[in-house]
Swiss-Prot record:
Swiss-Prot/TrEMBL domain comment: The SOCS box domain mediates the interaction with the Elongin BC complex, an adapter module in different E3 ubiquitin ligase complexes.
Biased composition (Low complexity): 158-169
GO molecular function list: epidermal growth factor receptor binding; kinase inhibitor activity; receptor tyrosine kinase binding
UniProt-recorded name of the protein: Suppressor of cytokine signaling 5
PTM annotation: Phosphorylated. Phosphorylation is induced by EGF.
Species annotation: Mus musculus
Alphabetical list of Gene3D superfamilies matching this protein: SH2 domain
Function recorded in the entry: SOCS family proteins form part of a classical negative feedback system that regulates cytokine signal transduction. May be a substrate-recognition component of a SCF-like ECS (Elongin BC-CUL2/5-SOCS-box protein) E3 ubiquitin-protein ligase complex which mediates the ubiquitination and subsequent proteasomal degradation of target proteins. Inhibits for instance EGF signaling by mediating the degradation of the EGF receptor/EGFR. Involved in the regulation of T-helper cell differentiation by inhibiting of the IL4 signaling pathway which promotes differentiation into the Th2 phenotype.
UniProt entry keywords in alphabetical sequence: Growth regulation, SH2 domain, Signal transduction inhibitor, Ubl conjugation pathway
Residues annotated as transmembrane: none
Subunit structure: Interacts with EGFR. Interacts with ELOB and ELOC; mediates EGFR ubiquitination and degradation. Interacts with IL4R; inhibits IL4 signaling.
Domain SH2: 381-476
Annotated stretches, region: Disordered: 22-59, 95-175
Induction of expression: By a subset of cytokines including IL6 and LIF.
């Protein structure tokens, strides 16, 4: 009995040493009954109740199974073994202590020492009873637990139990639930991570206010990101007013090369709307118009360059009503047609309609003769007066690149080219702006020349033509000569100017004949007055 008492005291001492570092965080409930051996099912239930409260349940279950007696061994007789006085079952219900500072490595080390020095640790284990079905289930669970520990050991790359304890303590203590889920499924399905530091960057980002965009000068430091954005916004939201001085103060160095073409187009648009500077000693031809405008257009539509009559009764009448072939795509003719429809509607409406505006506009022009009229007349591809249908009949069945030069049927344009491309007969008018001829005067990036013949020479090279531009490689020569009157006009126009024709001792009818091939260049547009129409 003395030996049994010493062994019992030794067992209690070692059990206290095992769980004493947990303090009040663990609830030890040792239940001893030498006459009753509880089933393995009860022990598994007791351990299962504590498992949901712990992060590493396989490790805790393994500890509990190694601390207790083997569930497959029972002792029916008290005097068979010297350890018969020791309780066969130790039920331990462990509550997790969230504030515990002890590491799992300490518990596992003490467990190994306890198992090695236990009285039955070095003995050969015998059993007086057969294994029941419940004991088999417990062994299977124990095998699964060990296999789970091996998998975890292989996964974290540890080779010893203490290394595994350190890794598991880091995984359980310092990793959140989202991080553990990402470790589990992240290899197959990566989870998006959101940095908490990135959110304030967007919320604190500086924005350009509307009041800053209304300023004439950039309020931000030169070369900064906000300054570049300010200039970019101002460029794409340029005011429609012809008096805008935005491009005068614009710094081209702050604009990227991608926006250079847009900047040039906007400058050309303002130049077409405002006019160009007249050359020195040029005779200015002034056109004044007074128009009653529909209230839908607050400032009125733009007056077309072809409107040359002066009307004092509140409306402007176009000079002629020509039937052109491509007026639906002509900017100036669209404005003229809107004015025609508006005038026809105003003629039936009452003069004292509320909300209408009376606009006084003064447009200054200079008149210039075609500089190379003699070269054009001597060119065999020039056919003179011809409409599009006659040109299509001549070009029918011709090879790709065949073209001819003819007079344009539109009054605001002088010449047009008809050519074959893509197995069709196409037409392109030659536009003029600021004494330069091109196929698109509104786009400064399109090739332009100071003469019409120079423009034709450029587009004879197929490598210089874009897919949408005219291809003028083969000229279709005319089959008749011009009259002597046409040739003399070309020679006289080469030696004089438009205003110089008035000084020639010629009849007025002949002077008008000499002035036929000329163009008007807008040099100034002035809005004299905008006032509501007073009721009569």
């Amino acid at each position: 009995m003395d030996k049994v008492g010493k062994m019992w005291n030794n067992l209690k001492y070692r059990c206290q040493n095992l769980f004493s570092h947990e303090g009040g965080s663990r609830n030890e409930n040792v239940e001893m009954n030498p006459n009753r051996c509880p089933s393995v099912k009860e022990k598994s239930i007791s351990l299962g109740e504590a498992a949901p409260q712990q992060e590493s349940s396989p490790l805790r279950e393994n500890v509990a199974l190694q601390l207790g007696l083997s569930p497959s061994k029972t002792f029916s007789r008290r005097n068979q073994n010297c350890a018969a006085e020791i309780p066969q079952v130790v039920e331990i219900s462990i509550e997790k202590d969230s504030d515990s500072g002890a590491t799992p490595g300490t518990r596992l080390a003490r467990r190994d020492s306890y198992s090695r020095h236990a009285p039955w640790g070095g003995k050969k284990k015998h059993s007086c009873s057969t294994k029941t079905q419940s004991s088999l289930d417990t062994e299977k669970k124990f095998g699964r637990t060990r296999s789970g520990l091996q998998r975890r050991e292989r996964r974290y790359g540890v080779s010893s139990m203490q290394d595994m304890d350190s890794v598991s303590s880091r995984a359980v203590g310092s990793r959140s639930l989202r991080q553990r889920l990402q470790d589990t499924v992240g290899l197959c399905f990566p989870m998006r991570t959101y940095s908490k530091q990135s959110k304030p960057l967007f919320s604190n980002k500086r924005k350009i206010h509307l009041s800053e965009l209304m300023l004439e000068k950039c309020p931000f430091p030169a070369g900064s990101d906000l300054a570049q954005k300010w200039h970019l916004i101002k460029q794409h939201t340029a005011p429609v007013s012809p008096h805008s001085t935005f491009f005068d103060t614009f710094d081209p160095s702050l604009v990227s090369t991608e926006d250079e073409e847009d900047r040039l187009r906007e400058r050309r648009r303002l130049s077409i709307e405002e006019g160009v500077d007249p050359p020195p000693n040029a005779q200015i031809h002034t056109f004044e118009a007074t128009a009653q405008v529909n209230p839908l257009y607050k400032l009125g539509p733009k007056l077309a360059p072809g409107m040359t009559e002066i009307s004092g009764d509140g409306s402007a009448i176009p000079q002629t009503n020509c039937d052109s072939e491509e007026d639906s795509t002509t900017l100036c003719l669209q404005s003229r047609r809107q004015k025609q429809r508006q005038v026809s509607g105003d003629s039936h409406a009452h003069v004292s309609r509320q909300g209408a505006w009376k606009v006084h506009t003064q447009i200054d022009y200079i008149h210039c003769l075609v500089p190379d009229l003699l070269q054009i007349t001597g060119n065999p591809c020039y056919w003179g007066v011809m409409d599009r249908y006659e040109a299509e009949a001549l070009l029918e069945g011709k090879p790709e690149g065949t073209f001819l030069l003819r007079d344009s049927a539109q009054e605001d344009y002088l010449f047009s080219v008809s050519f074959r491309r893509y197995n069709r007969s196409l037409h392109a008018r030659i536009e003029q702006w600021n004494h330069n001829f091109s196929f698109d005067a509104h786009d400064p990036c399109v090739f332009h020349s100071s003469t019409v013949t120079g423009l034709l020479e450029h587009y004879k090279d197929p490598s210089s033509c874009m897919f949408f531009e005219p291809l003028l490689t083969i000229s279709l020569n005319r089959t008749f000569p011009f009259s002597l009157q046409y040739i003399c006009r070309a020679v006289i126009c080469r030696c004089t100017t438009y205003d110089g024709i008035d000084g020639l001792p010629l009849p007025s009818m002949l002077q008008d004949f000499l002035k036929e091939y000329h163009y008007k260049q807008k040099v100034r547009v002035r809005w004299l007055e905008r006032e509501p129409v007073k009721a009569k």
